[in-house]
């Protein structure tokens, strides 16, 4: 080993099991940060969810074998995992964890290994979710339907009238229901709809879906990406129907915007973007 190369020990707990769990927790944190920046596709989001479930289960099992003073939560392990990554990749590229050493440390002639220069790489460009505008600029003079304190019969009639007169183009639907003290969300949908000769309405593109709680706090944000473009007519029709089916069923139970939001988000596998509290409501 070259004299100028050292091994930096990171406190991860005894044994490779803790090192592995903590490192995977760091990977989970990276996945979550990518998700916050809309940088994960659907398979990536699925891997995030599976990794989180796996880690939660493994940590729960592992903690049972540890003294109470040494048990760590997922969040604590994330912090250690991120520290491991920083030391390995950025602060000291030649570092080792729990006695494991990079290949370039084992071969002194390879001390200028290009893989150790990752700290010089710029961060991935992109906007954070909070930097994205609440309302898209490209929706000019949209048709807007607002349902507030209406019974189901009136709500269905208003939806029917507005949808039947809408030709095509940008469309905005706002649902705000608070009937009989039933908590609801305000759901705002921006999309481009096509009207076909057979009378079908198809959603060609979903630009945005925002869901707000009663205090106006944004609890779900689905922003348009290439993955949200609906290319199949039947898929578009199915998604559009999910917006209105609860009004057309005619049941007496008050229609809840939260259910509509979950229905639309689930079409894209994005229902996790609703907080558990709002999802339950």
Curated annotation (Swiss-Prot):
GO terms for biological process: symbiont-mediated suppression of host ISG15-protein conjugation; symbiont-mediated suppression of host PKR/eIFalpha signaling; symbiont-mediated suppression of host type I interferon-mediated signaling pathway. It comes from the Viruses. The keyword RNA-binding applies. Keywords: Host cytoplasm, Host nucleus, Host-virus interaction, Inhibition of host innate immune response by virus, Inhibition of host interferon signaling pathway by virus, Inhibition of host ISG15 by virus, Inhibition of host PKR by virus, Interferon antiviral system evasion, RNA-binding, Viral immunoevasion. Disulfide bonds: none annotated. InterPro entries: NS1 (IPR004208), uS15_NS1_RNA-bd_sf (IPR009068). Binds and inhibits the conjugation of the ubiquitin-like G1P2/ISG15 protein to its target proteins. Since G1P2/ISG15 is an early antiviral protein, NS1 may inhibit the host antiviral response. Prevents EIF2AK2/PKR activation, either by binding double strand RNA or by interacting directly with EIF2AK2/PKR. Also binds poly(A) and U6 snRNA. This is Non-structural protein 1.
């Amino acid at each position: 080993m070259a004299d100028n190369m050292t091994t930096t020990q990171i406190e991860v707990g005894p044994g490779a099991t803790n090192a592995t769990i903590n490192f995977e927790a760091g990977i989970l944190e990276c996945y979550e940060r990518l998700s916050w920046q809309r940088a994960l596709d659907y398979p990536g989001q699925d891997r995030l969810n599976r990794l989180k479930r796996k880690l939660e289960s493994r940590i729960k099992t592992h903690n049972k074998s540890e003294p109470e003073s040494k048990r760590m939560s997922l969040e604590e392990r994330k912090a250690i995992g991120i520290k491991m990554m920083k030391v390995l990749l950025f602060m000291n590229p030649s570092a080792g964890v729990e006695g494991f050493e990079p290949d370039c440390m084992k071969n002194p002639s390879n001390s200028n290994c290009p893989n150790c220069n990752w700290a010089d790489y710029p961060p991935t460009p992109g906007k954070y979710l909070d930097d994205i505008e609440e309302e898209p600029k490209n929706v000019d003079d949209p048709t807007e339907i607002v349902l507030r304190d209406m019974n189901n019969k009136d709500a269905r009639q208003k939806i029917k009238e507005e949808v039947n007169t809408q030709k095509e183009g940008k469309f905005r639907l706002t649902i705000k229901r608070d009937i009989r003290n039933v908590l609801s969300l305000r759901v705002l949908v921006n999309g481009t709809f096509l009207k076909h000769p057979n009378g079908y309405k198809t959603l060609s593109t979903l630009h945005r879906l925002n869901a707000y709680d009663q205090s106006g706090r944004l609890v779900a944000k689905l922003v348009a990406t290439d993955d949200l473009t609906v290319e199949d007519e039947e898929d578009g029709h199915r998604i559009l129907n999910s917006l209105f089916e609860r009004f057309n069923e005619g049941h007496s139970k008050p229609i809840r915007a939260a259910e509509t939001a979950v229905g639309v988000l689930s079409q894209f596998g994005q229902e996790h973007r609703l907080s558990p509290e709002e999802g339950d409501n």
